[in-house]
Amino acid sequence: MMKKIDVKILDPRVGQQFPLPTYATSGSAGLDLRACLDEAVALAPGATTLIPTGLAIHVADPSLAAVILPRSGLGHKHGIVLGNLVGLIDSDYQGQLMVSVWNRGQDSFTIEPGERIAQMVFVPVVQAEFNLVDDFDATDRGEGGFGHSGRK
């Protein structure tokens, strides 16, 4: 059975002036989030700001969470990434989705009303249960890390 996520539209422009989030293709994992702005916002190099999406979600199911991720084109072409790098939306959060954007580029960038600024993906959640142990069963890799397995 497919799970449903409750989405509350906080701004009447969403679904009218600005499209609802949709999956671009049948294979898309992420929904595009749009800037729900009254007017364009100029983001100077090095600056951060919070951009409203006009949406609130309540995932409700503790086996799911949502993550907000940058859009690859904005980051690669313009240096616009998320100010917190990744946004995590816990299942019990019920507030508006705000996107922290950071201009890590060298030029000012203008975010227009309705512009796609980030994407949201729903992911399964597994909570760890900690068990205190004296050691682990031996593996070939052991404690090797940070380049231990080589480049090829």
From Swiss-Prot:
The keyword Glycoprotein does not apply. Its EC number is 3.6.1.23. This is Deoxyuridine 5'-triphosphate nucleotidohydrolase. SUPFAM superfamilies: dUTPase-like. It catalyses: dUTP + H2O = dUMP + diphosphate + H(+). It is an enzyme of class 3 (hydrolase). Keywords: Hydrolase, Magnesium, Metal-binding, Nucleotide metabolism. Pathway: Pyrimidine metabolism; dUMP biosynthesis; dUMP from dCTP (dUTP route): step 2/2. One of its GO terms (molecular function) is magnesium ion binding. InterPro entries: dUTPase, dUTPase-like, dUTPase-like_sf, dUTPase_trimeric. One of its GO terms (biological process) is dUMP biosynthetic process. This enzyme is involved in nucleotide metabolism: it produces dUMP, the immediate precursor of thymidine nucleotides and it decreases the intracellular concentration of dUTP so that uracil cannot be incorporated into DNA. Coiled coil: none annotated. It comes from Enterobacter sp. (strain 638). Belongs to the dUTPase family. Substrate binds at residues 71-73, 84, 88-90, 98. It comes from the Bacteria. Its cofactor is Mg(2+).
